[in-house]
Amino acid sequence: MNINLTLIAQAISFAILIWFTTKFVWPYLLNAIETRQKTIADGLAAAERGKQELDMATQRSAEVVNDAKQKATSIIAQAEKRASEIVEEAKANAKAEGDRIIAGAKAEIDQEVNRAKEGLRQQVSALAVAGAEKILRKEIDAKAHADLLNAIANEL
């Protein structure tokens, strides 16, 4: 093998290329690689944090939904209880009002009955006085007495 000038020139140019690459190109390549590695690591870390936050948010949302369901159940139970109380109160008020109306009607009926009885008493006493007056004016006759009493009884 002959070592000639071309081979030496190629070795020198290769050495210059290596020196130039390590001095000027290689630091930029390493910097770009390190930057890319850092960006990828940050992205993976952010993805992991996002996954953890999603899990936590899912858990919190489940807790919130459960709390809301419990509150809704409680509110519905209270509303049903209040509704039944209102119904019972309305029934009691209606019964009291009905009893009051019935008592008023009975009192009014009793007053009307008493007025009617009083009116009948006055009419009976007036008829009795009129009958006694007629009997006293006429002669005492049994047949006439009986006829007058029958007439008075028919008028009653």
Swiss-Prot record:
Domain of life assignment: Bacteria
Compartment annotation: Cell inner membrane
InterPro entries referenced in this protein's UniProt entry, alphabetically: ATP_synth_B-like_membr_sf, ATP_synth_b/b'su_bac/chlpt, ATP_synth_F0_bsu_bac, ATP_synthase_B_chain
Membrane-spanning residues: 7-29
CDD domains cross-referenced by the UniProt entry: ATP-synt_Fo_b
GO cellular component terms listed in the entry, alphabetical order: plasma membrane; proton-transporting ATP synthase complex
Pfam family, one: ATP-synt_B
Major localization listed first in the record, in broad terms: membrane
Alphabetic keyword roster: ATP synthesis, Cell inner membrane, Cell membrane, CF(0), Hydrogen ion transport, Ion transport, Membrane, Transmembrane, Transmembrane helix, Transport
GO molecular function, one term: proton-transporting ATP synthase activity, rotational mechanism
Membrane association type: Single-pass membrane protein
Family matches, as HAMAP family: ATP_synth_b_bprime (MF_01398)
Subunit record text: F-type ATPases have 2 components, F(1) - the catalytic core - and F(0) - the membrane proton channel. F(1) has five subunits: alpha(3), beta(3), gamma(1), delta(1), epsilon(1). F(0) has three main subunits: a(1), b(2) and c(10-14). The alpha and beta chains form an alternating ring which encloses part of the gamma chain. F(1) is attached to F(0) by a central stalk formed by the gamma and epsilon chains, while a peripheral stalk is formed by the delta and b chains.
Function: F(1)F(0) ATP synthase produces ATP from ADP in the presence of a proton or sodium gradient. F-type ATPases consist of two structural domains, F(1) containing the extramembraneous catalytic core and F(0) containing the membrane proton channel, linked together by a central stalk and a peripheral stalk. During catalysis, ATP synthesis in the catalytic domain of F(1) is coupled via a rotary mechanism of the central stalk subunits to proton translocation.
Family membership: Belongs to the ATPase B chain family.
Protein name as it appears in the record: ATP synthase subunit b
Species this protein is from: Methylobacillus flagellatus (strain ATCC 51484 / DSM 6875 / VKM B-1610 / KT)
Species classification: Bacteria, Pseudomonadati, Pseudomonadota, Betaproteobacteria, Nitrosomonadales
Gene name of the encoded protein: atpF
